[in-house]
From Swiss-Prot:
It comes from the Eukaryota. The chain crosses the membrane at residues 634-662. Residues 1-17 form the signal peptide. This is Major surface trophozoite antigen 11. It is found in: Cell membrane.
Length: 667
């Protein structure tokens, strides 16, 4: 029967003796699995299989006087603890192959340590004061290649931790960590769920594969978003990209983030803001503000924005003035970039000089002004009834001789003879158009029956006109409900943005319409694309499909676009803001939400980047300045009130003095 010598050190396995209190020395019991064993017996006893037996009557212990290496146990390989600690033992009683979670130290002999736990934390002595040690928290390991010298314990190499992550830096030492040290990230391999600390620069070749980031000193592992790394800190002279996926050289100073292509600054250190591709110092708390009065105070007023932004009437900074509505990018009295109101009456957009570029519907550009169209037109090129370029809903446009403008009137009516319509079977934008002509050799061209001699363009192929319809249009024209249509004119341009050059089919349908097999299909309200009139496949902006509905529901008034529910906004409507990332509800600029404070009278805003504090209000109700705060810290409304009061006081004083001197003169 083979026995092996096992060595136990009072450590994390230590247990108070409960079963051998009369024979085992106090505090010399340990647990191996669920079994309590004694590692050092009272005088006259020796531990065999963890139990104290009479030393003189037991031949299994070759040396019962060991005192240099206390806590040794001889154990049979057929029972606990022997079969728990060792799988193979030599004839002289030395374990040669340790069980899982244990290792055989180098140069073990029958009178010294034969097997030790991978998680042993206390140095263990061999002959000649050689020492070895396990790794705290280690589950499986390999033995050191050679024993350490005195006072320098040689550590086992851990291959898997009981919990936490296995950390094995390049020098070959190993440890088990709850969190990986800086420069590493915790990776759980698909195979065996092995947890290891992997280098930020090296990544992991074990599944799931993770690509490392060169020159990264500190990283975060994003397991939920595709097993990717983001770098929080790069090596000297390098900075992470804005998305933190690379470390790059920077061309500028005071950069916090730099691009991988060219090294341009993408973000700045604290106390600096990005102006173009450079970081400039700024003490202002207003976002994207370069210069201000009363920096960081409650009455701070931005006086100049960074080069890519413009001052709003409320002294905030925005990149695009058009976001404020009827404003354009201009300059203020100090020649600083600022958003200016387009003051041309009935103008929709102004250029950078404040000149009108496009007029509102119902008006046309007349020099520098917007003049009214004829009341019958929706849009026009001039002011007469024959200058309409688009008609109101329910009215049809009849083009004049030049083919660019015409008159708006009632839609299709039926009649008899040449040029008359037999069936008004097509409706677009509320107006009816002809689908079958009364004369057999005529067909609807742009919705109107036209005789052969009156046609300026042969839109129907020869020999394809019969029974008042066209069965095959000339390539480049749209065949729709018995007629041929130009997609550059109404009503064709209402439903199709272009016909195929080699066919008479629609190349790009206008959202809300579909032309299939020469028939117009009108999608349900709010639907951009559909398979038929009642089955929507994609809703338009401002609408959403709810659950399994085949139609679209209008978004809440707080949403410009929404998804899944009417109040779940993707983009907020003007006058509203979101406090959460992604899709969520929008709150009025005037109201508070989740730590963000609204501003009464605010018409256009954004949440603060810090997610707390007041909204960034870009436009206020009332005056053109929007009640902006000026350098004194008073709103323009307050200043106006003070000015009026001052005028009244001065006028009263002058009147009093006049009366006084006149009366005194008479006296």
């Amino acid at each position: 029967m083979l026995l092996a010598i096992f060595y136990f050190v009072i450590s994390t396995l230590t247990a108070k003796c409960t079963t051998q209190t009369q024979t085992c020395e106090a505090e010399k019991c340990e647990m191996v699995g669920e079994t309590e064993i004694c590692t050092r017996c009272q005088t006259g006893k020796v531990p065999i299989d963890g139990k104290c037996v009479d030393a003189t009557a037991n031949a299994n212990c070759k040396n019962a006087s060991g005192d240099g290496d206390a806590n040794q146990v001889c154990g049979k390989m057929s029972s606990v603890p022997g079969n728990t600690l060792c799988t193979t033992v030599s004839p002289d009683g030395v374990c040669s192959v340790a069980a899982n979670e244990y290792f055989v130290p180098p140069n073990a002999d029958a009178t010294h340590d034969s097997v030790v736990s991978c998680s042993e934390e206390t140095p263990i002595h061999l002959a000649n004061n050689k020492q070895y040690i396990g790794v705290a928290g280690c589950a499986t390991c390999s033995a050191p290649k050679a024993p350490g010298e005195d006072n320098t314990p040689k550590a086992a190499t851990c291959t898997k931790c009981a919990a936490g992550f296995l950390h094995t830096p390049s020098e070959g030492l190993s440890s088990c960590e709850e969190t990986c040290p800086e420069g590493y990230f915790g990776h759980t391999a698909t195979a065996e769920s092995k947890k290891t600390c992997k280098s930020c620069t090296g990544g992991s070749s074990e599944a799931p594969n993770v690509k490392g980031i060169g020159d990264c000193l500190k990283c975060m592992y994003n397991e939920a978003s595709g097993n990717t790394l983001t770098c929080e800190k790069c090596s000297a002279q390098k900075k992470p990209s804005l998305d933190k996926t690379s470390c790059n050289d920077c061309t500028g100073q005071n950069c916090a983030f730099c691009s991988s292509s060219g090294g341009d600054c993408e973000g700045c250190d604290s106390g600096f803001i990005l102006d173009g591709q450079n970081c400039v110092k700024s003490d202002c708390k207003t976002e994207n503000c370069k210069a201000c009065t009363n920096p960081k105070a409650a009455n701070e007023v931005c006086t100049e924005c960074i080069s890519t932004h413009h001052l709003t009437p409320t002294s905030q900074c925005v990149q695009y003035c058009q976001a404020l509505g009827n404003y354009y990018a201009g300059t203020n009295a100090d020649n600083k970039k600022a958003c200016k109101e387009c003051t041309v009456a009935n103008c929709k957009t102004c250029n950078d000089q404040g000149q009108c570029q496009t007029c509102n519907d119902g008006f046309y550009k007349n020099g520098d002004a917007c003049s009214p169209c004829h009341e019958s037109c929706k849009t026009c090129s001039a002011g007469t009834a024959s200058d309409c370029t688009e008609c109101p809903t329910g009215k049809a446009l009849k083009y004049g001789n030049d083919g660019t403008k015409g008159t708006c009137g009632e839609g299709c009516t039926t009649g008899q003879g040449s040029g008359a319509c037999k069936t008004c079977g097509l409706t677009i934008d509320g107006a009816s158009y002809c689908s079958e002509c009364d004369t057999q050799n005529e067909y609807p061209q742009n919705g109107i029956c036209t005789s052969t001699t009156a046609r300026t363009v042969a839109t129907c192929k020869n020999s394809n006109v019969a029974n008042g319809i066209c069965s095959s249009c000339t390539n480049g024209f749209l065949r729709m409900n018995g007629g041929c249509y130009e997609t550059t004119k109404f009503p064709g341009k209402s439903v199709c943005e272009g016909a195929n050059a080699d066919a008479d089919t629609c190349k790009a349908p206008v959202p809300g319409y579909k032309v299939e097999a020469g028939k117009l299909v009108m999608c349900s309200k709010g639907c951009d694309t559909c398979s038929d009139a009642t089955t929507c496949t994609k809703c338009g902006d401002g609408y959403t499909k709810i659950e399994n509905s085949q139609t679209c529901t209008k978004c809440d008034s707080s949403c410009e676009t929404c998804t899944g529910a009417a109040t779940t906004c993707k983009v907020c409507a003007t006058g509203y803001y979101k406090t959460a990332l992604g899709e969520s509800t929008c709150t009025s600029c005037e109201n508070d939400s989740n730590g963000v404070i609204g501003v009464k009278g605010c018409l256009n805003c954004a949440p603060p980047s810090s997610s707390t504090g007041s909204v960034l209000c870009y436009l206020m109700k009332g005056e053109n300045t929007g009640g902006s705060v000026n350098k004194s810290g008073l709103s323009t409304g307050a200043i106006a009130g003070i000015s009026v009061a001052a005028v009244v006081v001065v006028a009263g004083l002058v009147g009093f003095l006049c009366w006084w001197f006149i009366c005194r003169g008479k006296a």
